């Protein structure tokens, strides 16, 4: 398949803001591939359209930043001065490269046109290049692609290299296109994506005529991690009890979500971003291997513990463990980890459609019960033990007063609050569900993404000291909700400045526009209505709690979350 044929449809998708039209254009692309291409082409375009070369579950990136792309563009005959001026003018490095390359006589005049397969395989190879001369090799490969491309192709190649296509396409739109073209149930194809996190594989299977609802490759599988199910906010414990009837309460741990996969004696542990962190936590792997279980996927919260106090250590200690690549044993001696398991998603077969109460029974056979109302003495002892693997502390009751006691006890041992779950509910990967709620003692902190950074003043003049922060809507569009600078240490500012310089896509002088990759957890005095921002809300006195390197843009809070918190707080006043 010629890359230019793909680009022509991408251009149509980019020029419309209407979701249904974008869906129709992708349907047109599927039809073109059906009649002119190969099944593999639909896999490739499904991923490329959303700025990916790898499936989401693989947690791999091309790893090229704007600075390296600019170096490659310079070798094609475009000056850095002209390029930066055009980027500033257009706000888009892809359009800047397209505009400037239109004025340059390309070597590709007598060469073969680029194919989709060439682009796809070349970009996959880029991610594998390592070593001392890796930057030069990458620059040369990117340069060759740009020289061989026509102006329109160069726009999309440049964006794809940065894994940001900027055409307003997302997974739900592609799934809707699959549903329309192949006449498959939309809910069914959404569920399949939830357990595979591989949009390309689904496309390839569909165009090959597979019965996707019964295809074993599209079922939940060990060593293919899934996105976690997410909880809703609730105004009160009483409201959540009404929603969940006889709920299961669990401690909301101050830790990091993990998935544990085990089969044939092999153990992999994944973070909530689906990163494989197995090598960073060898003591947990060793403990899991001691348990006589196989072909299983478990979910829990990894907590860094201070065994002298029985309370969790700061969240940053967990990130230190997860990021560590060297001297792991030394760090493990200082930072003790444990996992509180609260779900089993696979045990010899997929269990996500099984009610929580039945999944919990399986979990308790493996790790024992921890019923707060009847086993508190045992629980209190285990908190101070060297034991690493637990089932989560729980309470089954519809008594709000007892639930509040459990809530206060969970806070007293250093954790964040409680979860409230419907015991009859299935597990819905990657969705914020109405069968699971969270209760915390204060305003819910927000996870936001940084979209701009501004040079600081005074002591902060050497760093980016102020950050524009945004949440997302249902269409994954970003909405600014404020600016934050307080709460950041000098070490934080230095680290953030390094990252900003790697991901800035437009330089406005004192301010830069960024790829949305930095996630911050922020607290605030209140959410207030505001005409300053398009979304109509703003954070009053936001303050950074921590840099959430364990989270991506997929994990940030939504506009609906902001509205819900605003309403909850307004009703409390």
Curated annotation (Swiss-Prot):
Top-level EC class as recorded in UniProt: ligase
Single GO BP term: cell division
UniProt cross-references to InterPro entries, sorted A to Z: ATP-dep_DNA_ligase, DNA_ligae_ATP-dep_bac/arc, DNA_ligase_ATP-dep, DNA_ligase_ATP-dep_C, DNA_ligase_ATP-dep_cent, DNA_ligase_ATP-dep_CS, DNA_ligase_ATP-dep_N, DNA_ligase_N_sf
Residues the record lists as binding ATP: 250, 257, 272, 301, 342, 432, 438
Catalysed reaction equations from the record: ATP + (deoxyribonucleotide)n-3'-hydroxyl + 5'-phospho-(deoxyribonucleotide)m = (deoxyribonucleotide)n+m + AMP + diphosphate
Cofactor requirements of the protein: Mg(2+)
Active site: 252
Entry EC number(s): 6.5.1.1
Pfam family name, one: DNA_ligase_A_N
Keyword Magnesium in record: yes
Hydrolase as UniProt keyword: no
GO molecular function: ATP binding; DNA binding; DNA ligase (ATP) activity; metal ion binding
Keyword terms of this UniProt record: ATP-binding, Cell cycle, Cell division, DNA damage, DNA recombination, DNA repair, DNA replication, Ligase, Magnesium, Metal-binding, Nucleotide-binding
Family the UniProt entry places it in: Belongs to the ATP-dependent DNA ligase family.
Function: DNA ligase that seals nicks in double-stranded DNA during DNA replication, DNA recombination and DNA repair.
Name by which UniProt lists this protein: DNA ligase
Gene name in the database record: lig
């Amino acid at each position: 398949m010629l890359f230019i044929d793909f680009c022509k449809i991408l251009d149509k998708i980019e020029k419309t803001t209407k979701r249904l039209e974008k869906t129709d254009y992708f349907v047109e692309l599927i039809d073109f591939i059906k009649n002119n291409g190969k099944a593999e082409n639909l896999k490739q375009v499904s991923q490329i359209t959303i700025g990916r070369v790898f499936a989401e579950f693989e947690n791999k990136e091309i790893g090229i930043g704007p600075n390296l792309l600019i170096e490659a563009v310079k070798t094609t005959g475009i000056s850095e001065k002209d390029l930066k001026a055009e980027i500033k003018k257009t706000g888009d490095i892809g359009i800047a490269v397209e505009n400037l390359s239109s004025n340059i006589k390309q070597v590709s005049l007598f060469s073969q046109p680029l194919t989709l397969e060439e682009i796809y395989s070349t970009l996959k190879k880029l991610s594998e290049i390592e070593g001392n001369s890796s930057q030069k090799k990458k620059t040369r490969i990117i340069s060759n692609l740009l020289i061989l491309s026509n102006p329109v192709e160069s726009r999309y190649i440049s964006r794809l290299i940065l894994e940001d296509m900027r055409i307003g396409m997302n997974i739900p739109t592609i799934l809707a296109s699959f549903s329309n073209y192949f006449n498959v149930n939309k809910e069914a194809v959404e569920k399949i994506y939830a357990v595979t996190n591989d949009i390309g594989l689904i496309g390839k299977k569909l165009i090959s005529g597979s019965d996707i609802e019964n295809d074993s490759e599209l079922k939940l599988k060990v060593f293919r991690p899934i996105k976690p199910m997410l909880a809703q906010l609730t105004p009160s414990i009483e409201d959540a009890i009404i929603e969940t009837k006889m709920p299961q309460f669990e401690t909301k741990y101050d830790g990091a979500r993990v998935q544990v996969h085990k089969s044939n004696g092999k153990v992999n542990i994944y973070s909530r971003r689906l990163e494989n962190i197995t090598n960073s936590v060898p003591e947990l792997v060793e403990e899991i291997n001691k348990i006589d279980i196989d072909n299983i996927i478990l979910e829990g919260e990894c907590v860094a513990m201070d065994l002298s106090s029985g309370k969790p250590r700061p969240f940053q200690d967990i990130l230190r463990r997860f990021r560590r690549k060297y001297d792991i044993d030394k760090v493990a001696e200082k930072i003790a980890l444990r996992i509180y398991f609260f779900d089993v998603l696979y045990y010899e077969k997929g269990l996500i459609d099984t009610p929580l109460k039945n999944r919990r029974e399986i979990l308790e056979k493996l790790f024992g019960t921890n019923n707060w109302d009847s086993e508190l003495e045992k629980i209190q002892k285990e908190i101070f033990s060297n034991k690493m693997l637990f089932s989560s502390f729980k309470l089954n009751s519809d008594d709000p007063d007892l639930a509040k006691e459990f809530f206060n006890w969970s806070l007293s041992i250093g954790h964040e609050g409680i979860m409230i779950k419907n015991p009859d509910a299935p597990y819905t990967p990657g969705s914020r569900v109405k069968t699971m709620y969270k209760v915390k003692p204060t305003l819910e902190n927000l996870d936001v993404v940084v979209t701009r950074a501004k040079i600081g003043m005074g002591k902060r003049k050497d760093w980016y000291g102020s950050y524009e922060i945004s949440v997302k809507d249902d269409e994954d569009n970003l909405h600014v909700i404020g600016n934050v600078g307080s709460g950041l240490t000098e070490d934080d500012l230095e680290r953030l400045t390094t990252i900003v310089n790697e991901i800035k896509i437009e330089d406005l002088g004192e301010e830069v526009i960024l790829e949305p990759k930095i996630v911050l957890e922020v607290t605030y005095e209140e959410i207030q209505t505001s005409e300053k921002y398009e979304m109509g809300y703003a954070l009053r006195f936001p303050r950074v709690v921590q840099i959430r390197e364990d989270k991506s843009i997929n994990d940030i809070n939504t506009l609906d979350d902001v509205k819900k918190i605003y309403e909850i707080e307004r009703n409390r006043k």
